[in-house]
Amino acid sequence: MSIPLRPGAAPAPAAPRSSAPDPLAPLLDLPGVREAADAARAGIDRLLRHKVLRRESAGVSTESALRGARASAALEGADVPLAELRAGDVTDPVVQGALRVSAGLGAMVETWPRAPGQVLARLHVLAATDLADPAALGRPAAHAGPRLSGLIALITGPTTLPAVLVAALVHGELAALAPFGTSDGVVARGAGRLTGIARGLDPKAVSVPEVGFAELGREAYGSALAGYASGTEAGVAGWLVHCCRATEHGALEGLAICESLLRG
């Protein structure tokens, strides 16, 4: 299982210059956000410079996908040993859904910036098969429509906001909105990771942000998400900083994978 990027796939182009103000730009000035985003970017850059990635990026991405799926499932309460996952002995539907999402991200990178609604539906099908009514797979609830439209505008529109923060907003919106009613957390984390890949934060898909969230703890994750859902300045800032910290931890996990491959 891996996150195979299609040949020729490239990071999303830089946002075009515009005289109109960027409505998301003020988020950088929230307490602690700019510093956290810079630290996350620096952590990813250190990972991307690792010499193993010059010859083994596919292997690192494969391992990253596996560890990311395990951590995403663990955040849902389905915590299984990595060794069992490698052996293929795990049948838990939450874990299987997380594995399918991780494995499917690479094929979605090019479509995500153009047709995010289509990709979100596919992510839910992957995550929630065996957990939701087949008729409900890929179909967001009616109440989610207006807010999903806003999210789609965020994903497809230009912004000067760093990619790590755009990924955090995508993740937070989906997790807080829970548009599908099942497996929304797995979908949200998959969409957040996909945003980071597509916007050039981690174009090789070698970091493991899901492990970062898991290492910071389920309680801290839930608390930060509740803060974001509150809509307060402090709550939004707290979520963005939390996501940046998870990204830093995820970069360290990627470095650990690189080192393990280097040792053989």
Residue ranges of model-derived segments:
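FIC/Doc superfamily catalytic core
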Residues: M1-G264
